[in-house]
Amino acid sequence: MLSSTLRVAVVCVSNVNRSMEAHSILRRKGLSVRSFGTESHVRLPGPRPNRPVVYDFATTYKEMYNDLLRKDRERYTRNGILHILGRNERIKPGPERFQECTDFFDVIFTCEESVYDTVVEDLCSREQQTFQPVHVINMEIQDTLEDATLGAFLICEICQCLQQSDDMEDNLEELLLQMEEKAGKSFLHTVCFY
């Protein structure tokens, strides 16, 4: 493997639900993990489907929580957003954009194809410094509480297998094929370089 501890990133659109659920589970399992979003703003479900509540990425989870509490406590309790923001606040202060991160990872998981495309494009646009490989893996995860949890456990299982692998580079493709069969999901996978 590339390092003694697998360095993992999980990326979704807003760094609120899917990436943070995976962050929570991977952290509890003792893995080195960070989570990110890729959009220009954090968008949460609003009063109507076409009217999201929009926050800047500099807004903390606590500020979002308090704002939604003031706006409509019942709605945001019922749809689970207050629960999600409370969990997130216990993990880190606020959302982060992947494009602003300069840390190196061994594996980056994305939660939808558009996020995968953004991450790969960003990595390819950076000047290569160390030529260290980073595996970018996309797993389609619907942006619901249940699917985020199921996806997070699958990401965790993959990470644990990679952590135990003698040679991640040689074993990753085979592992992804096994996981595709087991989970009934297909993965996109590419290698970029730092």
Curated annotation (Swiss-Prot):
What is any one GO biological process for this UniProt entry?
Answer: termination of RNA polymerase II transcription
What top-tier enzyme class does this entry carry? hydrolase
EC number annotated for this UniProt entry: 3.1.3.16
Query: Could you cite one Gene Ontology molecular function of this protein?
Result: RNA polymerase II CTD heptapeptide repeat phosphatase activity
Q: Which SUPFAM superfamilies match?
A: Phosphotyrosine protein phosphatases I
Query: What InterPro entries does the record point to?
Result: Ptyr_pPase_sf, RNA_pol_II_suA
Q: Which UniProt keywords apply?
A: Hydrolase, mRNA processing, Nucleus, Protein phosphatase
Protein localization: Nucleus
Q: Which residues cross the membrane?
A: none
Gene3D superfamilies, A to Z: 3.40.50.2300
Q: Which GO terms describe its cellular component?
A: mRNA cleavage and polyadenylation specificity factor complex
Where along the sequence do coiled-coil regions lie?
none
A Pfam family recorded for this sequence = Ssu72
Q: Which reaction does it catalyse?
A: O-phospho-L-seryl-[protein] + H2O = L-seryl-[protein] + phosphate; O-phospho-L-threonyl-[protein] + H2O = L-threonyl-[protein] + phosphate
Job of this protein = Protein phosphatase that catalyzes the dephosphorylation of the C-terminal domain of RNA polymerase II. Plays a role in RNA processing and termination.
The UniProt family comment states: Belongs to the SSU72 phosphatase family.
Please identify the protein, giving its name as recorded.
Answer: RNA polymerase II subunit A C-terminal domain phosphatase SSU72 like protein 1
